[in-house]
A protein has these predicted regions:
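Retroelement reverse transcriptase polymerase core
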Residues: 1-168
């Protein structure tokens, strides 16, 4: 079931490619809930949605994207002036790192400022990093769902400044 269900605390999201597939997935989840004597309050359930906001993401037929309300928060984020503010920004930005190629490399100058032995000095490099992360997060792509019938290949690369991985669907 982990290929079509996301469970977070008391929220369950079931996603599928087709209506027929969704009917089967829904049946499987409801049977599992009944078998385990778990109950869903019908008035709080929504079925057959084509688009849903879930944990800061929008899931639709096109794929998964950043929730527009979060994009607005990122766009309006003012330049961090303390280590705490940098950590807060990196916390939000890091949650969406899967949408940003080279995230760790771009965030490096900001991450370095959060170290205990580093004096807080906002440099031009930090400013560029902050602006680039905001730009990339506010123009993030829609991530598609793999069809699961073909093979995957993992490409990796590492250096002293970052680590990169790509999962390629062939």
């Amino acid at each position: 079931m982990d290929k079509f269900v996301i469970v977070f605390i008391d929220d369950i999201l079931i996603y599928s490619r087709t209506e027929q597939e969704h009917e089967e997935h829904l049946r499987m989840v409801l049977e599992t809930l009944r078998k385990e004597q778990l109950y869903a309050k019908f008035s709080k359930c929504e079925f057959w949605l084509r688009r849903v906001s879930f944990l800061g993401h929008v899931v639709s037929e096109e794929g998964i994207s950043v929730d527009p309300s979060k994009i607005e928060v990122i766009m309006n984020w003012e330049r961090p002036r303390t280590v705490t503010e940098i950590r807060s920004f990196l916390g939000l930005a890091g949650y969406y790192r899967k949408f940003v190629q080279d995230f760790s490399k771009i965030a490096g100058p900001l991450t370095n400022l959060t170290r205990k032995d580093v004096k807080f000095v906002w440099s031009e490099e930090c400013e560029k990093s902050f602006i680039e992360l905001k730009k990339r997060l506010t123009s993030a792509p829609v991530l598609g769902l793999p069809d699961g019938t073909e093979d995957f290949v993992i490409y990796s690369d590492a250096s002293r400044k970052g680590l990169g991985l790509s999962l390629i669907h062939i």
